[in-house]
């Protein structure tokens, strides 16, 4: 029995470590939240949806499959060749036979390396194309969501879905699926080869498999937990950065840098801890598998060496030195894919979790959808009518209550009222940015719900108080990628809205760089560019929401002049903060708490001494006081 002492020692060490791992596993068994990988979508459904993106590249995957067979064959054949070479060297041999064996091994190795390289290149290219298709579909779907739906999802979360999560999915196509398949066949092929070579030594190796399975189950549990923590921490910090970098000027104005830094530090440390936990899990699992690998090698050398020295035969199979060398290589190639399988399966689960998050965004049904019988509008005169329209952002809290009015084609109508009266909401409903609950909104006598949304918005030009300019040039922001508009037409429109006065002073004119959100231009300049952007697309109805707010007097005069010119273009709807800009409107509608109080021309409303008269008087006296100062 003394000769079995080393094996007993190895078994005792493995047993103690296994007991400790089982105890750790049991400690979190009942903590459902510890798993953190619960999903609402089945793996099969996710894989089917991902397969739709892979289907156009099926021929490429077939080529990869053929190349994979060559690398699998190398893993199975190469140990046999090396074992044969060892037996040649151990005995009397001819140099020619040795040269032949080495040449065969070198040829198989080179062929395998070539096939592995081609396989990697094809997978990387195809994988990136698939993920590019997925990203484009995701971005297109996000663009189709209604305003209220976009308001419910943090921008940072959407950025994470389009970038981080799609990157995680790319691993599925570039590596995971092929490697999982390859490793499974390698394990099966090596097992068959070992059984054919020597039953006894193969059974010895198989004694370690239950421990590998147990370690893998435990590893999967803890690695899932670590992966989910890492994903959540990444999403949190991306959302925080997206919001706070956009509002960093407010932070500086109110001197809250230290408080924001403390918040960021907490989220950054949370992300660091999540990374550390994931690293720790892998740093424990890999040495454990390596311990089993080393233990099996020790057993091989011990049992195989004894069998070889004592010339022991088992079921008619002798243990030669070549057999020991072959098994040594097989054990290495057996344990490596097993370790990889465990890790790759976990990464696959992580990728599937990312895919579910992506598909959860893509499964959001746009609340604003075209009716089955929706029509295209080739031309719009600009007649608008509200019939008893009710609307609420939150159920039961009505923002508009039974609003009715009529706007004739090419008429200018202004909406005034205190904050929260529903002015901007009316303009948003006309463009179908939101869906109203009751009533009707008609364009040229047609219910807007019977018109295709894209067709409806094509005839509207909307200018907001907070003008958004994209990174690029002045030209690209005016034409918005519409091809074929010459510079002469762009400059003509700029002159029409008085934007040429500052554009001509710029070093590069229309090619002047526009930084993020147009921060290198003043509010008035951004507003004039917004006017030009609207006019150049020749809308039938123009909508201006607080277009003259927060600008200086000189720029206001330019904008008023532009407004007077724009009145001749088509129907114009204006939400005005400064009543001086709407005195020439054909009709002024005064709102309060979602209801129309009065309407009429500027002179008619002043003569009634109602709410409009009060607002105008307050602004007039305020303007006089400012002038006196």
What are these regions (language model features)?
Residues 363, 370-371, 377-629:
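ABC-type nucleotide-binding domain
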Residues 2-11, 59-80, 84, 101, ...:
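Alpha-helical segments in transporter systems
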Residues 77-79, 83, 111, 177-220, ...:
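A hydrophobic transmembrane-helix motif
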């Amino acid at each position: 029995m003394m000769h079995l002492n080393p094996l007993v020692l190895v078994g005792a060490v493995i047993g103690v470590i296994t007991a400790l791992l089982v105890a750790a596993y049991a400690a979190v068994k009942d903590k459902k939240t510890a798993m953190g990988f619960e999903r609402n979508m089945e793996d099969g459904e996710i894989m089917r949806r991902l397969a739709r993106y892979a289907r156009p590249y099926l021929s490429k995957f077939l080529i990869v499959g053929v190349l994979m067979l060559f690398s699998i064959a190398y893993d199975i054949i190469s140990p046999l060749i090396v074992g044969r070479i060892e037996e040649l060297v151990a005995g009397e041999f001819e140099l020619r036979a040795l040269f032949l064996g080495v040449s065969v091994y070198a040829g198989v190795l080179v062929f395998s390396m070539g096939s592995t390289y081609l396989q990697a290149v094809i997978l990387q290219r195809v994988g990136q194309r698939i993920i590019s298709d997925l990203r484009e579909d995701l971005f297109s779907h996000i663009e189709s969501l209604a305003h209220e739906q976009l308001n419910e999802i943090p921008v940072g979360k959407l950025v994470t879905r389009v970038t981080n999560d799609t990157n995680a999915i790319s691993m599925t196509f570039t590596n995971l699926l092929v490697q999982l398949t390859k490793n499974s066949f390698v394990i099966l092929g090596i097992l068959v080869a070992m059984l054919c070579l020597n039953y006894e030594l193969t059974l010895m190796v198989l004694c370690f498999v239950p421990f590998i399975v147990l370690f893998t189950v435990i590893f999967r549990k803890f690695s899932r937990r670590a992966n989910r923590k890492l994903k959540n921490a990444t999403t949190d910090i991306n959302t925080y950065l997206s919001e706070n970098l956009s509002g960093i000027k407010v932070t500086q104005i109110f001197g809250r840098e230290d408080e924001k830094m403390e918040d960021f530090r907490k989220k950054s440390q949370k992300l660091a801890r999540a990374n550390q936990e994931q690293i720790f899990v892998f740093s424990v699992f890999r040495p454990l598998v390596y311990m089993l690998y080393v233990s099996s090698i020790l057993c091989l050398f011990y049992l195989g060496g004894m069998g070889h020295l004592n010339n022991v035969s088992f079921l008619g199979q002798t243990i030669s030195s070549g057999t020991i060398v072959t098994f040594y290589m097989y054990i290495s190639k057996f344990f490596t894919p097993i370790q990889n399988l465990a890790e790759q399966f976990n990464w696959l689960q992580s990728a599937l979790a990312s895919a579910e998050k992506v598909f959860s965004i893509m499964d959001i049904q746009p609340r604003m959808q075209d009716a089955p019988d929706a029509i295209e509008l080739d031309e719009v005169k600009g007649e608008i009518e509200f019939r008893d329209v009710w609307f609420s952002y939150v159920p039961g809290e009505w923002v508009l209550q039974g609003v009715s009015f009529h706007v004739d084609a090419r008429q200018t109508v202004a909406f005034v009222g205190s904050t929260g009266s529903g002015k901007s909401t009316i303009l948003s409903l006309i463009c179908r940015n939101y869906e109203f609950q009751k009533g009707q909104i008609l364009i040229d006598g047609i219910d807007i719900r019977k018109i295709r949304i894209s067709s409806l918005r094509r005839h509207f030009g909307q200018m907001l108080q907070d003008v958004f300019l994209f990174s690029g040039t002045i030209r690209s922001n005016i034409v918005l990628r519409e091809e074929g508009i010459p510079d002469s037409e762009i400059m003509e429109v700029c002159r029409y809205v008085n934007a040429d006065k500052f554009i001509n002073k710029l070093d590069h004119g229309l090619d002047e760089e526009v930084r993020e959100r147009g921060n290198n231009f003043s509010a008035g300049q951004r507003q004039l560019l917004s006017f030009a952007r609207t006019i150049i697309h020749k809308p039938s109805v123009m909508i201006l929401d607080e277009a003259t707010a927060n600008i200086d007097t000189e720029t206001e005069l330019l904008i008023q002049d532009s407004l007077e010119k724009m009145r001749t273009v088509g129907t114009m709807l204006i939400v005005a903060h400064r009543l001086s800009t709407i005195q020439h409107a054909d009709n002024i509608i005064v709102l309060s708490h979602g209801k129309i109080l009065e309407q009429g021309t500027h002179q008619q409303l002043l003569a009634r001494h109602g709410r409009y008269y009060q607002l105008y008087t307050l602004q007039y006296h305020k303007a006089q006081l400012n002038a006196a100062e």
